[in-house]
């Protein structure tokens, strides 16, 4: 391959990355989400702050009366319309006595921003949030992009001594290795991220994972189509750090925290929804909402008691 073709291919990879990752993420208003009101007694405090880029960030504190003092979680959502897609997880932690701090990143959900500025923007938002609320005795827990965010926060903040990464990635280049064959192409995206965010784009999680004395719990399914197991959890295992425990699960794809029944239900209902949209059978907002009338969202978000039990024991120890 001559140089011009190689550069053209790298440019295409960067464009695909921008088009799929660096966009605005809002709710599909037809798709149901759990609400705080679905959980009697759950308290939600909503606030905002302006981040260093001038974007208004919405953040939330969830808890039940009688929560245990100094048992705080920072829940880092995955890429998508914000924390509301994770209310089942958040409520599970609150029910166990934790206070949960969470946020919608720049360009996501209720927060401002025309798009997500970079994959490291959530890290910046979360760090600035922690600096604001002063909950320094806190455990980051995150899924997917949120898993990467939780990992970076644990790396960056000495006060964090424990973190949970669910289906997360080590770096953006390791994430891209699930979609491209050559490391040189994946590294192109890493260099692009450094240009987008020179401060947070240079984070070296590999060195951190090799040497850290922090306690980390990493949970990943071997058949994850979104974040490749071998290039992420597999690399963590190879480092052999005794302070990091990797729980490998099978047949859970990108959501190992969900029960098998919830995954089957979600795949069937959402698959049917997307198919009917493609077939132009759900052409109006009313028709799309009606599709979910007999499909309670709680059946799509039921937590796996074994996996959540492992997480709760880890963060409670």
What are these regions (language model features)?
Residues 1-51, 55-62, 274-290:
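An N-terminal hydrophobic leader/cap segment in hydrolases
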Residues 79-91, 230:
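The serine-hydrolase catalytic nucleophile loop
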């Amino acid at each position: 391959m001559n140089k011009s073709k190689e550069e053209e291919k790298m440019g295409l990879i960067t464009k695909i990355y921008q088009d799929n990752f660096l966009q605005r993420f809002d709710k599909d208003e037809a798709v149901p989400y759990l609400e705080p009101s679905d959980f009697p007694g759950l308290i939600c405090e909503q606030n905002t702050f302006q981040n260093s880029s001038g974007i208004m960030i919405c953040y939330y504190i969830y808890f039940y009366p009688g929560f245990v003092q100094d048992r705080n979680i920072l829940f880092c959502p995955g890429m998508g319309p914000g924390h509301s897609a994770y209310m089942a997880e958040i409520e599970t932690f609150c029910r166990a006595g934790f206070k949960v701090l969470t946020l919608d990143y720049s360009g996501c959900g209720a927060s401002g921003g025309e798009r997500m500025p970079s994959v490291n923007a959530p890290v910046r938002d979360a760090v600035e949030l922690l600096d604001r609320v002063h909950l320094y005795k806190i455990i980051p827990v995150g899924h997917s992009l949120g898993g990467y965010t939780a990992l970076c926060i644990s790396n960056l903040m000495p006060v964090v001594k424990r973190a949970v990464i669910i289906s997360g990635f080590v770096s953006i280049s390791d994430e891209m290795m699930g979609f491209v064959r050559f490391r040189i192409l994946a590294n192109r995206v890493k260099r692009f991220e450094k240009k987008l965010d020179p401060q947070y784009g240079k984070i070296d999680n590999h060195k951190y994972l090799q040497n850290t004395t922090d306690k980390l719990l990493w949970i990943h399914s071997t058949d994850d189509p979104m974040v490749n197991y071998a290039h992420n959890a597999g690399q963590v295992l190879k480092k052999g750090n005794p302070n990091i425990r990797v729980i490998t699960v099978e047949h859970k794809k990108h959501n190992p925290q969900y029960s098998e029944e919830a995954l089957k239900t979600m795949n069937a209902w959402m698959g049917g929804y997307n198919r009917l949209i493609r077939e132009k059978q759900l052409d109006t907002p009313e028709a799309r909402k009606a599709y979910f009338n007999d499909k309670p969202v709680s059946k799509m978000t039921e937590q796996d008691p074994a996996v959540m039990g492992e997480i709760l024991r880890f963060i409670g120890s």
